[in-house]
Amino acid sequence: MRGSVIGSGSFGTALANVLAVNCEEVRLWGRESSVVEAINTQHENPTYLKGIPISERVRATNDLQEALVGSELVVLATPSHATREVVAKAQAYLPRHVPIVTVSKGIENGTLLTMTELLEDCLPEEFHPYLAVLSGPSFAKELARRMPTVVTIASHWDKVALRCQKALQTETFRSYTSTDVVGVQYGGALKNVIAIAAGMADGLGMGHNARAAIITRGLAEITRLAVRKGANPLTLSGLSGMGDLVLTCTGELSRNRHVGMELGKGRKLPDILADMKEVAEGVKTARSAHELELKTGVELPICHQVYLIAHEGKSARTAVVDLMTRQPKSELAGV
């Protein structure tokens, strides 16, 4: 079996390592020539996964055609804001009747499309039944080090999810299938916004009680919006919902939590982002969440405050006060 991964950041590289267990060859596409060369000559990605060995079955390339032709499984691991551009360039080389799995956790600014909706918008209908999404609590460094990781793979067509599950199953990587493409994607995207809020609380020194409240009430607003968009509420209590949310709000490797912590300490967002090698998806997703709140009328108070802090310059401490002094409600309001 031959697999392809588009995107040579930390998560794309880690998934290429997973695929290499069951594939004779994995082609990994990346923009950065230095990363491609290092993977091919040193079997390491020193830019994004320094010190972690990459399987010799993984072959990196800057050429999309070389990466895709003849593949039996395609993983799209580009940042959400770059997915449309990359897919437009890759379309001519995408194999037919092969699962295409997106692992990007975002909602496109402006269009408010999830990643599978974006792919449906970009690709001819013949590709649509083969689209899938992989999401769940999965830090790239732990995945690459073959530490136990469990995720959800969702597709409208169960046979596609099962094909992906089989290709990715290893002794240290397990997946569960789902047909709730909507719930899996909203859980994966919006938890990044909530993680920024949790990080801000930590940066402000507000304690464990505050963090637990943000996680719990964050899950409530993610669920409200996801259900409005057609999700099964039970999906949000699973790996791609609560599981990913807890990890991203508490883990030391969380980029979104890091952004929040630095904002809580008073740093400016452009300075924080300038110091980061990889994308914190929650920053852009906060804008999409704000637009979705206005469009749907679903209350997203935590996401709203993150948007105001990240994009309108509001003080993190003032945002906490505003959240705490909102009108009292039933815990199940809006459910």
Swiss-Prot record:
Its EC number is 1.1.1.94. One of its GO terms (cellular component) is cytosol. Belongs to the NAD-dependent glycerol-3-phosphate dehydrogenase family. Signal peptide: none annotated. Pathway: Membrane lipid metabolism; glycerophospholipid metabolism. It comes from Myxococcus xanthus (strain DK1622). The keyword Disulfide bond does not apply. This is Glycerol-3-phosphate dehydrogenase [NAD(P)+]. Keywords: Cytoplasm, Lipid biosynthesis, Lipid metabolism, NAD, NADP, Nucleotide-binding, Oxidoreductase, Phospholipid biosynthesis, Phospholipid metabolism. GO terms for molecular function: glycerol-3-phosphate dehydrogenase [NAD(P)+] activity; NAD binding. It catalyses: sn-glycerol 3-phosphate + NAD(+) = dihydroxyacetone phosphate + NADH + H(+); sn-glycerol 3-phosphate + NADP(+) = dihydroxyacetone phosphate + NADPH + H(+). The keyword Nucleotide-binding applies. GO terms for biological process: carbohydrate metabolic process; glycerol-3-phosphate biosynthetic process; glycerol-3-phosphate catabolic process; glycerophospholipid metabolic process; phospholipid biosynthetic process. NADPH binds at residues 10-11, 31, 105, 140, 255, 279, 281. Its main location: cytoplasm. The active site is at residue 191. SUPFAM superfamilies: 6-phosphogluconate dehydrogenase C-terminal domain-like, NAD(P)-binding Rossmann-fold domains. InterPro entries: 6-PGluconate_DH-like_C_sf (IPR008927), 6PGD_dom2 (IPR013328), G3P_DH_NAD-dep (IPR006168), G3P_DH_NAD-dep_C (IPR006109), G3P_DH_NAD-dep_N (IPR011128), NAD(P)-bd_dom_sf (IPR036291).
